[in-house]
Regions:
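A polyanion-binding, active-site-adjacent surface
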Residues: 1-187
Length: 187
């Protein structure tokens, strides 16, 4: 078991050295992807450390996820420090192949796309799989519709952080989120 944990840690360290920004538990069953960073996050602050992260943690707890079931992933690149030439540009969307590598390494049961920028990165990374979904709106990752991609439930919220300032929008994203209870939940 220690060998598996060490291998996972090494893989995650490698991803972070190539510009991937993550926060939380890499073994979480749910990954929250944010592409439209706020000013604090753009300046190097911790991802999802503000009101949006607090609201997401509270929502996940209310839905039955454990407190440690929180993993945030930026859909835009942070600084790369592996010393090799890279196609990763800090502040730009993660390249499709790198985003896909990260998501496959994390291997969550569910993926929540918090904004349009994260939807665009997901669409690029999983274009072939999304094209195989019969319903057009689901394949386009329309907010509120759950898409099944390689056995994962994928849900776009359509601007989570902005929704926090409006009561009606908050209710809408809460209704969307309730479609992703933990696997095996009794409800």
């Amino acid at each position: 078991m220690e060998a598996l944990a060490a291998a996972a840690e090494q893989e995650l360290d490698s991803l972070q050295s190539r510009g991937v920004r993550m926060v939380g538990n890499a073994f979480s069953p749910i990954v929250l992807v944010k592409g439209e960073l706020n000013d604090r996050e753009k300046a190097g602050g911790r991802l999802l450390a503000g009101a949006d992260g607090d609201a997401l943690k509270a929502a996940l707890l209310a839905m039955g996820y454990a407190p440690e079931d929180f993993c945030g992933l930026a859909a835009v690149a942070g600084p790369a420090d592996d010393g090799s030439p890279s196609s990763v540009i800090e502040g730009a969307p993660l390249p499709s192949d790198l985003f896909r590598e990260v998501l496959e390494a994390l291997d969550p049961e569910a993926v929540v796309l918090l904004d349009d920028a994260s939807v665009a990165v997901m669409q690029g990374a999983y274009a072939e799989e999304l094209a195989g979904i019969e319903d057009f709106d689901t394949a386009m990752l329309t907010p509120g519709l759950v898409a099944h991609v390689l056995g994962r439930r994928v849900l776009a919220l359509g601007g989570f952080e902005a929704a926090l300032s409006d009561a009606h929008s908050k209710q809408r994203v809460w209704a969307y989120l309730k479609q992703l209870p933990p696997e095996g939940a009794p409800y």
